Amino acid sequence: MNETATSPGSAAEAQREIAEEFAYFTEWSERYQYLIDLGRQLPPFPEASRTEAWRVHGCQSMVWLVPSGDASRMHFDAASDSAIVSGLIALVLRVYSDRPAAEIVATEPDFIQAIGLAKHLSPTRSNGLAAMLAKLKGYATAAAGSGE
């Protein structure tokens, strides 16, 4: 792995920090509560963006994901009507938002396995998380391809 992949402020660093934070909790009930707390800390999401155009399909709950920026730095705003999914959004945004499109596309969501999330999410939440990541990476791929 090259140095930039693990430099402070990188997606890899964000994933490492998430794994360290979740290591503090021994019970999954504590981890779920932490996820809910993270979701509550998301910035307000504009009602005008809660449209079909920004909706992530494949999620059981309602999820919206809005990209902005360009290939040099992409920002994402997102929201859900579910408390736990909002926490998942907070983790995803921490890893992927405000990064270059190329880094977003190249970054695998290793934190999901690292914190044991994969085996504790229901199949519908796992599918929704995969759909959200696919949509986010799709936006980044499009931005990187257009050179915006």
Stretches found by the model and what they are:
Residues 2-6:
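Intrinsically disordered, low-complexity regions enriched in acidic/Ser/Thr/Pro/Gln residues
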Residues 39, 95-96, 136, 140:
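Generic structural signal for hydrophobic core residues of well-folded globular domains
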Residues 24-28, 79-84, 124:
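Structural motif
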Residues 66-82, 93-96:
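Conserved interaction-surface patches within small, structured recognition/assembly domains
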Residues 31, 61, 84-89, 100, ...:
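Amphipathic alpha-helical interface surfaces
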Residues 47-68:
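Structured beta-strand/loop patches that form or line metal/cofactor-binding pockets in enzymes
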Residues 9-48:
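Extended low-complexity intrinsically disordered regions
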Residues 80, 102, 107, 111-148:
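C-terminal binding/interaction regions
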